[in-house]
């Protein structure tokens, strides 16, 4: 396998700290990073270089663990170990914290906007997932507290085109939720990982979900049978593929490219890997191959990988070493 990941640039994003997470805005013109230094940094392209456009340093008292852009690109949400979630509004080049969401008992581990932009999900070490509703006046109201997990909840992500929410937990499981008669309910539990599930990502259609774990595997789950049209019966999610034997340590993040279908992973062995579904593989029993492997992508654990929303071959990663890196992926011939 020839080396198909090329380093474009490396940036010291959060010096002397961990860089925890990266998020592209919907148009791909800005990249938000967050870290153990309690800041969020907004990066933009200046010629060929990524430069820091602004530092959001006033919102949080502790580590900022995750950031998420609203679908319109005008708001950024940040989840922090200080048990709060800040909502930042973009005004020209600057960002202003317009509200702080409180209620979790301790560290907020993740935050995610629904595709509609009117719902926000947060999750915490307090084992709960909260769903917030946003109205026209930019007021945020908690509409549901979900206590389905028995341990720390690490990550939340929304289905790309329906209001279905997924969460990953230290209890080794993944839960799916949807709204039912004005309340949110857990509609499925995905079990199979043998240790903490760190992250998860839907494919472009939302029919498949990739999950990654402390058990060193990535699992691909597929939605089978959605019941009769219009019926309320829950789709059945089944593990259709397990990527095992590739990662030597915890897999901290997985990201599904919505333009090409390639899957990127971030691992505790300091490496970034790319997987692609094999041509002609059976959708109900898909097979994937490792198509790129960058062993020393960073000098410490890789925490996050994220594909650019518009440029199909551009990937960003970040690490405990405080750096973020930009990669060009070339599909092997």
Swiss-Prot record:
Q: Does the keyword Transferase apply?
A: no
Identify the InterPro entries for this entry. Answer: CIAO1/Cia1, WD40/YVTN_repeat-like_dom_sf, WD40_repeat_CS, WD40_repeat_dom_sf, WD40_rpt
- Keywords associated with the record: Repeat, WD repeat
Which stretch is the leader sequence?
Answer: none
> In the UniProt record, does the keyword Nucleotidyltransferase occur?
no
Checking Gene3D superfamilies in the record gives: YVTN repeat-like/Quinoprotein amine dehydrogenase
Q: Where does the chain cross the membrane?
A: none
The GO biological-process annotations, alphabetized, read as: iron-sulfur cluster assembly; protein maturation
Q: Where are the WD repeats?
A: 14-53, 59-98, 103-142, 148-187, 192-231, 246-285, 297-333
**Record-level GO cellular component terms:** cytosolic [4Fe-4S] assembly targeting complex
Q: Which domain of life is it from?
A: Eukaryota
The protein's job, in short, is: Key component of the cytosolic iron-sulfur protein assembly (CIA) complex, a multiprotein complex that mediates the incorporation of iron-sulfur cluster into extramitochondrial Fe/S proteins.
Assembly and interaction partners:
Component of the CIA complex.
Tell me the PANTHER family matching this sequence.
Answer: CYTOSOLIC IRON-SULFUR PROTEIN ASSEMBLY PROTEIN CIAO1-RELATED, WD40 PROTEIN CIAO1
The family annotation for this protein states: Belongs to the WD repeat CIA1 family.
Put simply, this protein is called Probable cytosolic iron-sulfur protein assembly protein ciao1
Source organism of this protein record: Xenopus tropicalis (Western clawed frog)
Please name the taxonomic classification of the source: Eukaryota, Metazoa, Chordata, Craniata, Vertebrata
Gene that encodes the chain: ciao1
